[in-house]
């Protein structure tokens, strides 16, 4: 059961901080511009690794790369404009939930359920708590 799987993951992982800074792109492989993570990468990778086991195991189309997509499947001029406009973006937020979405028949992603991250906080690379 997917919900039981996600509940167990959320219980094993604590909240963490994500710091977003600057932009990047997956072009020419994929027409995507994203805001890059400067902090929280390891926490995202741990959640991804845990999630892609059991009922959600399966091959990836691309290697996992934590990011926030801000533009995709638009023309190159629009991608260039977004990448330049957000180049100096800098923001921080706390991740407190793992959320399950479904992709409906109309192609829209819709939230179904949130799972609170209630596990212990992981240590950062310098040995401190986030």
Name these PLM-found stretches.
Residues 1-130:
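Histidine-dependent nucleotide/RNA phosphoesterase domain, centered on the 2H-phosphoesterase fold
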């Amino acid at each position: 059961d997917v919900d039981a799987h996600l509940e167990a993951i959320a219980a094993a992982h604590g909240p963490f901080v994500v710091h977003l800074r600057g932009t990047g792109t997956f072009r020419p492989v994929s027409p995507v511009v994203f805001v890059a993570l400067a902090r929280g990468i390891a926490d995202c990778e741990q959640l991804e690794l845990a999630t892609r086991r059991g009922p959600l195991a399966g091959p990836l189309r691309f290697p996992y790369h934590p990011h926030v997509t801000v533009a995709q499947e638009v023309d190159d001029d629009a991608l260039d404009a977004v990448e330049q406009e957000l180049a100096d973006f800098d923001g921080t937020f706390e991740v407190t939930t793992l959320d399950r979405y479904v992709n409906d028949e109309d192609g829209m992603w819709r939230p179904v359920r949130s799972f609170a991250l209630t596990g212990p906080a992981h240590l950062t690379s310098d040995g401190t708590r986030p």
